[in-house]
Amino acid sequence: YGGTLRVVTTGKQYVYGRLDSSAKGIKSKSSLTIESGTIWVRATGGEGSEGIESKNVMTINGGDIAVYAYDDCLNASNNITINGGSVYCYSTGNDGVDSNGTLTITGGTVVASGTASPEDGFDCDQNTFKITGGTVLGIGGGTSTPTANSCTQRSVIYGGSGSAGQYIGIQSSDGTNLMTYMIPRTYQQMTLLFSSPQLENGSYTIYTGGSVTDGSSFYGLYTGAIYDGGTQAATFTANSMVTQIGSASGGGNPGGGGGPGGGPGGWGW
C-alpha cells in the first residue's frame, strides 16, 4: 500500500540446457494484487523481459503504474483485472497487456501500447474480454476484441495506419472530443481500441493529424485539450457494444519477439 517503487532490469535471457530464465521487473509465482502507490518498471533485456508478471491472477485496484518492457508489460498466466488506478504500458517487442485467461477492466485509466502485428495493445487470446468502466485505450498491430455480451460499456476498434507524433481524435456529432491521443510510434498497420463512459449510442467522426492545445496528457492520452485541424479518417455509429471500422486486426495470436524500439520520454531514470 502506498509508497514509490522503481525497478530497472537489463539482463538478457539465460539458457542452461533445457532451462531458461529471463530478467523480469516484478514477478510473482502466485497471485499479485496492486492496491495503490507509484510503481515504475523498466525491463529492457530482451525476449522474456516482462515488466510485471503473475503466474496466477493479477489484480490492479489503484495506483500510478508505468511499465516499459521489451516483452509484455503486464502478463498473467490466468486472469487480469483492472478496477482502478492509472496504468500505462509500452512494449518494444510484444503486447502491452497479455492475459492468458480473461481480461476485465471496470475502472481507472489504462493506456496500452504494443508493437506491430501480430502483437497487440490488449491480448487475451480467445478468452473473455470484459469492459464495464474506465477509460481504455489500446494500440498495436492488433487487439483482442471485447466480448460484447459481457460488456456494459461501449468500445470502438479502428484500423488504419499511424505515424509517431501524429494525433488521432474521436468527436461526437456535436463536436465534443471523446478522445485525443498522440500515436507513440509508426504503424504500417495500426489497430486502436477505445472505450469510455462517454461513448454512447450515437454518431462519431475519427480525425487524424491536426494539433492540440491546452489540456493535460497521460502518456499521450489528453484530457481537457482543444483538438482541431485534423483530417476526417472515418465515421461510425456506436449502436452496438463493440463497433469495428477500418482495417482492424484481431488479436489472440501467440506471443512473439520483436525488434527494439524507442520509448516515450521520461523513462531515463
Regions found by a protein language model. Give the residues of each.
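A composition-driven surface/loop motif
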Residues: 1-269
